């Protein structure tokens, strides 16, 4: 089991400190603030539909993680003396030994290595949990996310939807 207290200090490409940590129950406001700071096109690339708000059911799904079948990390940085969530990543077990990953990073921090840090930590946690494979569904135009996943060894696999690129990473 991945501890709900997981926390690692890292640095962005520009040298600023960042914390990659487990999502906590009290992070909902910070997560929603991060979504508000993310442009609609970035959210569409993450959710595959135009998204500006979430239903109560969606919020509950995103916040109710068990760190076994649903693992979620946030990227948090100090902004003007206050912690601010600037990104998040998660994996959800979709069948025994396999999980799907997804990420979102606030636009102002894209290109600073946040997505790569989240990916690295989720891959490490998935290996520690003895998962055999991670997968991600990415829109063809989401080149930045495709590049991040490619650096970690994700490769194109056959998916069900021709409008979406299905990537997989064997962990074993």
Tell where the protein language model's regions lie, with residue ranges.
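Long, contiguous binding/interaction regions
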Residues: 1-172
